[in-house]
UniProtKB/Swiss-Prot annotation:
Cofactor: [4Fe-4S] cluster; [2Fe-2S] cluster
Enzyme class name: transferase
Binding residues for [2Fe-2S] cluster: S110, C142, C201, R277
Pathway(s) where this gene product acts: Cofactor biosynthesis; biotin biosynthesis; biotin from 7,8-diaminononanoate: step 2/2
Subunit text: Homodimer.
Organism for this UniProt entry: Methanococcus maripaludis (strain C6 / ATCC BAA-1332)
GO BP of this protein: biotin biosynthetic process
The protein's name: Biotin synthase
Taxonomic path: Archaea, Methanobacteriati, Methanobacteriota, Methanomada group, Methanococci
GO MF, any single term: iron ion binding
Similarity annotation: Belongs to the radical SAM superfamily. Biotin synthase family.
Length: 327
């Protein structure tokens, strides 16, 4: 990791972040700072809380497409017209095979399914897959199964897995990206999961037309909810989705690399003691600037995403090593 030298103003922000004294306006004002200053502050906070480590995770789209929800960014929604592979829940053998294929590189493996939630039968099969992975690999298991009820959350607690449920954006902006469920539906699941004692991963997507204020409000909600890991995604608009059309016709401006990096840094500063993990869209948005995001990150999703291809894993490993980090 590079040597960190903070100027007096940056040092003050660093100290306020560490002591939890940055308010909403303070975080919004960070947008006006130079990117290099934000990277320096973020890097200092990362070094304080997580040293030089980058935690790697991988996901599997274990059930794809035909989702009844109307999220405008998602190629799996039946309300969009994206051409993707659709299939029912994969077998435990297929899921285990996928997990084993990334075990050499990843610390975590997440089973992700499309839909608002899972049926009882699907849930039973997923529990079997969790047991297979835990018994036959060294991977920590995560699941992203939608809006789960208390009984299913308790069953997952018994299996010692981490739950993933993205808030996606701020409460104020959520109605612009989805109306088939609301923000509070997700909040209720997160609160119940935390009450039961589950580890929780949640986050959002940058580049859907939201403001910096919306991003800061998302970070503050994640802090208030006490999530353990924060998953940040950069919008990669997929043909056939409603948001692709909005960008095509200039209704929404696509996110650029500087915008994305600043947002990642502000997430780090707002949530200094959380695992900040960069996931989908980083290759599309950051391109050659991906390496700079590592100064603000504790985690990176590697391999393929739900319906899009990720960067070659060896390229990610090389990038991490060249930037002076460990995994």
């Amino acid at each position: 990791m590079r040597e960190i030298k903070l100027n007096p103003d940056s040092l003050e922000i660093y100290e306020k972040s560490d002591s939890g004294k940055l308010n909403r306006n303070d975080l919004i004002d960070l947008w006006n700072l130079d990117l290099n200053d934000l990277l320096n502050i973020s890097c200092a906070l990362k070094k304080l809380f997580n040293k030089d480590k980058i935690d790697l995770c991988s996901i599997m789209n274990a059930k794809s497409g035909i989702c009844p929800e109307n999220c405008i960014f998602c190629s799996q929604s039946k309300h969009n017209t994206s051409k993707i592979d659709t299939y029912e829940l994969k077998s435990k053998e297929e899921i285990l095979k996928n997990a084993k294929s990334v075990e050499k590189y990843s610390n975590r493996f997440s089973i992700v399914v499309s839909g608002k939630t899972v049926t009882d039968l699907e849930f039973e099969k997923i529990i079997e897959s969790i047991e297979e992975i835990q018994n036959k690999t060294k991977l920590k298991v995560c699941v992203s199964l939608g809006l789960l009820n208390k009984d299913k959350l308790k069953a997952l607690k018994e299996k010692n897995v981490r739950i993933h449920n993205n808030l996606e954006t701020s409460e104020n902006y959520f109605k612009n990206i989805c109306t088939s469920h609301d923000y509070n539906d997700k909040v209720k699941v997160i609160l119940e999961a935390k009450k039961i004692g589950l580890e929780m991963c949640s986050g959002g997507i940058f580049g859907m037309g939201e403001s910096i204020e919306d991003r800061v409000d998302l970070f503050l909600d994640l802090k208030k909810l006490g999530v353990d890991s924060v998953a940040l995604n950069l919008l990669n608009p997929i043909y056939g989705t409603k948001i692709y059309e909005k960008i095509k016709f200039g209704v929404i401006s696509p996110i650029n690399s500087i915008d994305a990096l600043k947002s990642i840094c502000i997430a780090r500063i707002a949530l200094p003691d959380k695992v900040i993990r960069l996931c989908g869209g980083r290759e599309h948005v950051l391109k050659d600037m991906q390496k700079y995001s590592l100064f603000a990150l504790d985690g990176l999703m590697i391999g393929n995403y739900l319906t899009t291809n990720g960067q070659n894993i060896q390229s990610d490993l090389k990038m991490i090593k060249e930037m002076g980090f460990e995994r």
